[in-house]
């Protein structure tokens, strides 16, 4: 490595150099292209890590990111990890040689790579749109416990005392999902209704296969069908996100149950389809496109700071931004039906 990279602070005999170069040629080794400091400053590429592109939530984040990048004359390259550790690791290994102007994670990095992510962040501006507390990098935070609590409080205020929460797999890798469920359950526990919430989560296999365009919709649909085959006393169902909520609604309507007359439904994310008049889904707004814009804004500030004539004397800032979630009441929630 030192021979091929022509390290200035070490020396080797001509014979050694020739042997190494000959071996490298025979093996087909190609020395990675190096960027000079000058060229690296001219990089106009922002890399975005996404776990999936099948949920409009991530498309909304990308729109926010791209709107700022375009304004500033930057391009955006999306790395779809498909929630697979191997793919995420491959992309991370590419980052030093790609040397983008900035990197944005639209979800929590896998804990196995957090050290690597923090190391990259020391050299390249990097922002995480996350729910992980105490990350040592710039982050757009979201309190998912508060989101779950807000969903539960709305249903409690409408008199729902037997409810279900439907979610994708609640694994250690997806802690933001678990926190949303925990916030929901704790709100019911405060009212002495610890046994009022039924949690139905998809099997872990859902996160291990390549997601299809309707994966989360099918989780909502399938688990609601399963729930209805087991019991009919539930008066409200919460979906971890809006796509799951759409599946819940279709499963209920297939069983001739009215929404919200028989069963209320609430989602989260306020994606574009939730606002359409025929759907009109009650949901939680947490300002997804603005999070994307903020993440890209932070990258731009870091780039400008690094290019400043006074960059060596400026303090290093870590940005943490959080939006307060907001309940959006529409037509899929109503007062709990009375027992007959």
Residue ranges and their predicted role:
Residues 151-193, 198, 313-332:
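An alpha-beta-alpha
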Residues 1, 38-54, 154, 162-170:
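Short beta-strand segments enriched in small/hydrophobic residues
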Residues 140-166, 182, 186, 217-226, ...:
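Hydrophobic alpha-helical segments within soluble ligand-binding/sensing domains
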Residues 69-80, 185-217:
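Short beta-strand elements in bilobed, periplasmic/extracellular small-molecule ligand-binding domains
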Residues 24-57, 61-63, 72, 95-97:
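N-terminal helix-turn-helix/winged-helix DNA-binding helices
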Residues 67-111:
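Central regulatory/effector-binding core of bacterial HTH transcription factors
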Residues 106-150, 166-171, 243, 269-281:
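Flexible loop/hinge segments that line or gate small-molecule binding clefts
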Residues 221-340:
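Flexible loop/turn connectors
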